[in-house]
Amino acid sequence: MTYNNSQQFSAVIFAGGNSTRMGQDKSLMFGGVERIRQLCIDCGVVKIITLCGSEERVSMFEGEVWPDPTHCQKLSDVIRWVRGELPGPIQFIPCDAFDLDRDSLQSLLQSGGGVPLDSNSNRQPLLANCPADYQIGDGSSVNSLFDDLATIVIAGRSDSFSNYNEKSQLNERHQS
């Protein structure tokens, strides 16, 4: 099912990590969560939730902010929990989607569901677009949750779907 109305979506921004490998909190870098929230607003998404990790991080972000439930031990548990809490389609977005722009997000929202490929042809499950009727997988890894979603190839936009886990990746990307 393709959704042409972005208002039908809930956007869920992942901002709960410690970012120790980056040396700073990724949720605050390059405009951070606020930039991603604004992209969602610009695309017409009305329900935007930031998953902040611990309760202590709630005050760091604007809008609707949810701490991770204490029964969730890893990110796959949190994703499974969120899927149970939110009816309708969900667009997931990691806080380190530094290159995501409005046109790329709009393309994801209009994709009908799936997991986009980045510029290295890797599936980026933290940018999954989950249709309302999608049943999250049973595995314990984030990848396994979205195994049954199609791979989305958006011509000319794959750079927008990269994420960054180490400073060296960020340096390489922004020097080219």
Report the location of each language-model feature.
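Nucleotide and nucleotide-moiety/phosphate-recognizing core
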Residues: 2-123, 138, 147-160, 168
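Short glycine- and hydrophobic/aromatic-rich loop-to-beta-strand nucleating segment
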Residues: 124-132, 163
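Aromatic-glycine-rich donor-binding/catalytic loop that engages nucleotide-sugar donors
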Residues: 130-139, 173-176
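Short, basic/aromatic-enriched C-terminal tail that caps enzymatic domains
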Residues: 162-176
